From Swiss-Prot:
Biological source species: Mus musculus
Keywords: Disulfide bond, Glycoprotein, Immunoglobulin domain, Membrane, Repeat, Signal, Transmembrane, Transmembrane helix
Protein name as it appears in the record: Selection and upkeep of intraepithelial T-cells protein 7
Expressing tissues: Expressed in skin, thymus, testis and, to a lower extent, bladder.
Residues of the Ig-like V-type domain: 26-141
SUPFAM superfamilies membership: Immunoglobulin
Cytoplasmic topological intervals: 270-287, 351-395
Gene: Skint7
Pfam families for this protein: C2-set_3, V-set
Lineage of source species: Eukaryota, Metazoa, Chordata, Craniata, Vertebrata
Glycosylation sites: N92, N139
Amino acid sequence: MMKPEFFCFSGFCVYFLFLQVVVSSEKLRVTTPTRHLLARVGGQAELSCQVIPPHSVMHMEVRWFRSGHSQPVYLYRGGHKMSEEAAPEYANRTEFVKEAIGEGKVSLRIHNINILDDGPYQCSFNGSGFIDAAIMNLNVTAVGLETEIHVQAPDADGVMVECNSGGWFPRPQMEWRDSKGATLPHSLKSYSQDEARFFYMKMTLLLTNMSHGSIICCIFNPVTGEEKQTSIILANELFNRDRIWMESLASIVWIMLSVYILYIICFYWRTGCASGCLSKCFCVVTSWPVQIVHLLFCTGTFFAIYLPHRSRVSLSDPQFPLYNNWITELLFVILFLTICFALPIILLFIQFQFTSLTKWEKNKDGIMDQPRLGKAHETSSLYRKKTGKSWEQEK
């Protein structure tokens, strides 16, 4: 018969071993060296996790998966890769690194990173009554390849500069800066995404003068802090748009007035009209060529007053460039067509007036010469009569 002391000792040993296993199991946990990983599009990322304290996980199930996905990214079970259960979008892009699996360290290497790989991942261990997982976040970044600055045609409000850049992820930050590094307020900012989730950015700036020097378009990635800059220097002539078309308008008005004055001078010079001939002056002023000149002058004056003070659309309106361009271009078209139509008619009318005045002067001279011819004819008749009488007397 066994002694009671032996049973007590055996029970104590079993309890001690059970407690050791429980304590050891409770101490095991899964961790990761870093919870945030950065990877570039087209590059690779290594998702590492380990069991601490070090413990072999060779016969455990190791799984990487993403929340919201029914299939795992990678599954290791029974010492083999379970390819048929993995998500198809990761096929031929994953590599299981298990050199330190005996120490509880494993890694999943993902090749050819794309934007769809961005997001959180979980690494879990399951086996021998132990199950635990660790979460890590993979941040995929992409830096745009090209940044372009386009300058739109100047209008009455200034010069619109546009900065375009694509191929960014995540959405970058954009801002305009001057040559001193000061931030300039943008007029409009917008973005879009393509099917691959790349961001395409667009930002505009309205410049009314050249006091800013060179203009710099800055784009930087908020995750990596990488920045790209593209600068442009605008010629001063672009900011003289208002002065140019105002000078053109003034030149047109002066041409019309010169034609008007020339027409009046030529009319008075041809007719010999004195300065007090109000009736003839009124006829000249009310003639239709002069009325056309008046119409052009009033139209040009109206646009010269209206354009600088007209109510304008908001700078954030997508149709802002269209609105400010068409009204100025319409002015030039109207003036051009009016000049091309009216100036030849005025010149032809002046030529017609000169021809009419010349004929009128010739007719006037002919009428004045008729009495002289009559007197000469009478004189010659009397002379012949006197000559005939004297000849008869002599005979």
